């Protein structure tokens, strides 16, 4: 908003995308309308930005720029990953990151508990649970997540964040 008022050019990455069930869309589209240059991740998103009234000459389909980061970072070997986690990791396992659906009718705790019940249907699988994001309902999920991991220490690891390389691994 300040950049718009002060006439500071803004370049927006990933405009035109849709996140169903989240208020991210309203924020993303507002940023699109305040931006001067638009770098979208795919042609349908480029078309959506143009449909929002932005000049086609200012909208570029450049792909998902974060994917380039994947090419520059090799995954960790499994033993190094396990050592960095302090968790004896073996296959099969699930890596689970749950973010609340911000516009859902159901409260996040109910949805999260249902997901944990589904994970219990796979007792031979280990589970790495990362904390939710900062969206509404995320904080309420953390104690549930920690209790779940605490009650299954040989099978479940709860961790606030893996960071990029461990998540990739």
PLM region spans:
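Active-site and donor-binding regions of nucleotide-sugar-utilizing enzymes
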Residues: 1-56
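Hydrophobic/aromatic beta-strand patches that form the interior of the parallel beta-sheet core
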Residues: 11, 39, 60, 128, ...
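Cofactor-binding loop segments of dinucleotide-utilizing enzymes, especially the Rossmann-like FAD-
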Residues: 15, 43, 64, 132-134, ...
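Short acidic loop-to-helix transition motifs that present clustered carboxylates
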Residues: 18-20, 45, 66, 162-166
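Short secondary-structure transition/capping segments
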Residues: 22-26, 72-73, 140-141
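Alpha-helical scaffold segments in soluble metabolic enzymes
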Residues: 30-33, 48, 69, 114-118, ...
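A nucleotide-sugar donor-handling region in carbohydrate enzymes
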Residues: 35-110
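Donor-nucleotide binding loops and adjacent catalytic segments primarily
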Residues: 76-169
């Amino acid at each position: 908003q300040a950049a718009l008022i002060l006439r500071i050019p803004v370049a927006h990455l990933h405009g035109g995308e849709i996140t169903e069930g989240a208020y991210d869309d309203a924020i993303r589209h507002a940023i699109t309308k305040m931006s001067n240059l638009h770098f979208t991740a795919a042609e349908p998103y480029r078309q959506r930005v143009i449909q929002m009234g932005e000049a086609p000459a200012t909208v570029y389909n450049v792909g998902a720029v974060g994917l380039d980061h994947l090419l520059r970072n090799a995954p960790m070997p499994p033993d190094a990953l396990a050592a960095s986690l302090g968790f004896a990791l073996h296959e099969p396992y699930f890596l689970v990151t749950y973010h609340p659906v911000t516009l859902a009718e159901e409260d996040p705790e109910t949805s999260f508990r249902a997901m944990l019940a589904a994970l219990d249907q796979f007792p031979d699988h280990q589970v790495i649970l990362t904390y939710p994001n900062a969206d509404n309902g995320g904080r309420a999920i953390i104690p549930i997540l920690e209790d779940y991991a605490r009650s299954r220490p040989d099978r479940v690891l709860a961790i606030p964040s893996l960071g990029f390389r461990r998540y990739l691994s």
